[in-house]
């Protein structure tokens, strides 16, 4: 029972152009991943890292942010270069000659505050949440991205999120607790078995136990875990290495949360 309609994305490899090219092609029954960025825009040497420049407290929509990053409009292309910022700080032509061209051409973003609106119709249509919980759906999710900069794989994660618009469920495998691994939306997760689904229902992280992320929808979770198959763990012929023991503790912890 393999789900060939599901697309698995290795977010570390998103930093490579060849991998993103693969994601944008249909594979088996899995539709392509949609993106605002063209191959040329995420090819090696382009948007490998973009810098934060604190110019505004305005909260941009995620779509506006991606337009800023991806637009081919000449006016935007010139204004988003770090060279433009240096000129606003009073740099003259002769001053810029001492600034590496790479730095001058680096893209910056003027605010780290983003807003991701929830398409409630798509949320229900795609089965992301139970229709009985429609009253819990938020209108938007506020995302605070780093005040340092973004690497290419992080840009593309935001890109995929924006373009998807809640048409396909998005899951995270867990195993990491870094905010960036969940696109800075750890308060909007739902534990489904061993994975975390992005849902438009806020569940704040418990500060006393920050490793227990996400809400649980009991009926769905119960249905999932009842399909798990176990065996041979009790055998004395099986060596349980440290990683295996860690995984078994995670499984037990998830079952404990359901109980």
PLM segments and residue spans:
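ER/secretory pathway lumenal C-terminal domains and tails of membrane proteins involved
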Residues: 2-258
């Amino acid at each position: 029972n393999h789900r060939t309609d599901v697309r698995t994305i290795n977010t570390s490899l998103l930093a490579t152009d060849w991998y993103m090219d693969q994601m944008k092609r249909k594979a088996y029954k899995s539709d392509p991943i949609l993106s605002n960025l063209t191959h040329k825009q995420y090819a090696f040497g382009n948007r490998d890292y973009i810098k934060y420049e604190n110019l505004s407290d305005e909260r941009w929509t995620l779509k506006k942010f991606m337009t800023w990053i991806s637009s081919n409009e000449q006016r935007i292309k010139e204004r988003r270069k770090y060279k433009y910022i240096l000129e606003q700080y009073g740099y003259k032509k002769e001053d810029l000659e001492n600034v590496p061209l790479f730095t001058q051409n680096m893209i910056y973003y003027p605010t780290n505050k983003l807003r991701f609106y929830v398409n409630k119709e798509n949320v229900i249509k795609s089965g992301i949440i139970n229709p009985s919980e429609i009253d819990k759906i938020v209108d938007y999710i506020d995302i605070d991205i780093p005040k340092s900069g973004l690497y290419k794989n992080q840009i593309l994660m935001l890109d995929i999120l924006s373009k998807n618009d809640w048409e396909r469920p998005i899951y995270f495998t867990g195993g990491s607790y870094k905010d960036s691994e969940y696109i800075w939306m750890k308060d909007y997760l739902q534990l489904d078995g061993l994975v975390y689904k992005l849902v438009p229902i806020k569940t704040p992280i418990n500060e006393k136990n920050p490793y227990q992320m996400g809400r649980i929808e009991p009926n769905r979770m119960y249905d999932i875990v009842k399909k798990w198959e176990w065996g041979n763990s009790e055998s004395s012929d099986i060596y349980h290495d440290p990683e295996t023991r860690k995984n078994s503790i995670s499984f037990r912890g998830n079952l404990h949360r359901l109980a």
